[in-house]
Regions:
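Surface-exposed, low-hydrophobicity beta-strand/loop segments enriched in small/polar/acidic residues
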Residues: 1-169
């Protein structure tokens, strides 16, 4: 089910030089929500509620880009693609774990995670129909055992793998 309001997403770790925010244009008239997975299609942000295999995951949507006030839920694109921008936080974040065949376990650490929807990552590409979300790091229960609010969640380094010289951080 598509989001209808902003959500709270928790970062894992401390932001540093490798997790600088990026700014991307929003697709014309599209609405994306703070705290959701930031995906682009044809170069512009779209809601990850119905991801496509060619989408690119960047991080978590944080706020409007320069020139726009953050006063209402959601970020709405302008009359043309990219005329309104969003700031995206990069790095590792706690996301909802997929279910069934899409559920991660600790044994899957280091595996590729795929975008299921705005707040959920899973273990399968669903027949190559889902975009890469990033790298599954571990279960929240192992990384933050004293955080009951994160129960059942996973940590994903969001972004596209780039071999040994870069990629998700």
């Amino acid at each position: 089910m598509a989001l209808t309001a902003d959500v709270r997403t928790t970062r894992y770790g401390t932001p540093g030089n490798s997790t600088q925010p990026v700014n991307r244009g929003i697709t014309a008239a599209a609405t994306v929500y703070r705290g959701s997975i930031a995906t682009t299609r044809s170069g512009y942000l779209v809601a990850a509620s119905a991801p496509q295999s060619g989408d690119i995951a960047w991080g978590i949507i944080d706020k409007y880009g320069p020139g726009y006030a953050d006063v209402a839920p959601g970020l709405v694109g302008g009359t043309s693609n990219g005329s309104v921008t969003a700031e995206i936080q990069t790095g590792s974040f706690f996301l909802q774990n997929g279910s069934g065949a899409d559920a991660f376990t600790a044994a899957n650490a280091g595996a590729t995670a795929y975008v299921i929807n705005e707040t959920t990552a899973g273990a399968t590409s669903n027949g190559n129909t889902r975009p890469v979300c990033g790298e599954f790091t571990d279960m929240a229960a192992n990384l933050a055992p004293n955080r009951p609010d994160l129960a059942g969640m996973i940590v994903v380094k969001i972004g596209q793998p780039a071999g040994s010289t870069g990629g998700p951080s």
